[in-house]
Amino acid sequence: MSLMSFKSQVVDAATNKSKTETINYRTTYQDKEYKKQATVYVPAKYDNKKKHNIIYLMHGSTESGRDFYQDGNFKKILDKLNRVDKLKNTIVVFPTYYPNKSFVNSDYYRDRPLNKNFAKKELTKDLMPAVEKKYHTYAKTTDNEGFKESRRHRAFGGFSMGSITTWYVFENNLKYFHDFLPMAGDSWTIKPDGGAVASKRTASRLAESTDSRSFQILAAVGANDGTSGSMTPQIEAMWRLPEFNHQNLKYYTQKGGSHSPQSIGKQFEHYAGELFKK
C-alpha cells in the first residue's frame, strides 16, 4: 500500500465517523445576558456543501443538554439510525432551557416560565440562527423567512419538561417546524398538568395554534411512566377535534418504558423513520 493510499484511508475513516460538537451562543432572560452552549450531533459523512435535516431535542428537569445526550445513549442510537438509512444525514441539537446552572432546582414546576421563554424567544431568536449559520441545513437564510421555507426539514422534541417545551414550540412556532416529538409530558399552556386537569381546554388551545400548514405530532410515553395520566386524556381530547386525526397526531406507548432518558431514546428510535416524510 502506498503512503498516499494509506493517508486517503485515514481521512475516509475520520470522515465516516459522527462527531459530538459544542456550539456557543448568547441569549437574554429577564433583561440579563447569558452565555450558553448546546451539544450538537454531527452525522458521519457530514458535508457542509449539502443540505441536512435538523432536530432539536430538549432534556428534562435538572438535566443539561449534554446529560440528556449521554444518558439517553443518543450517539449510539443516531449512529445506528444513520447507518441503516432510517434517519440519514440529520443534525441533532441538544440545548438547555436553563439560562445557567443557578436556575436548576428540584421543583420542576418552577421550570415552566423557562420552558415557555425558550420556546417563544430563545429558540428562534438566538439558538436556531447560531446553529443553522454554522451547519448547512435547508434554511437558505437564518431569518424568519428562511426558517419558514425550510420548516418541513426541522423537528423539535423533548423529554418530560422538554416535552412541555415541545408543546409550547408547537403552539408558538408551527411556522418554523413541521414535526414534533413530545415524550413523557403534556401541555401546560392552560395550567401545570393541564393535560390531566384541563384536557379539553388544553386541546382547544393547541387546536387554535394550527392553520393551513401541515404538521406531524409523534407523541410517546412509557407504559410504566406516570406522565401517561396527563398525556393520554390530552391526546384523546385532541383527537376529538377536527384539527387533529390519527395521521397528524400519533401516540405510542412503549412497552416496559419508564420515565427515563433511556426509555426516551427508544421512543425516539421508534419514530425516527417517520420524520421528514414528504
Show the residue positions of the predicted features.
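Non-catalytic cap/lid and distal C-terminal segments of serine-dependent acyl enzymes
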Residues: 6, 10-278
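Bacterial N-terminal signal peptides
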Residues: 1-5
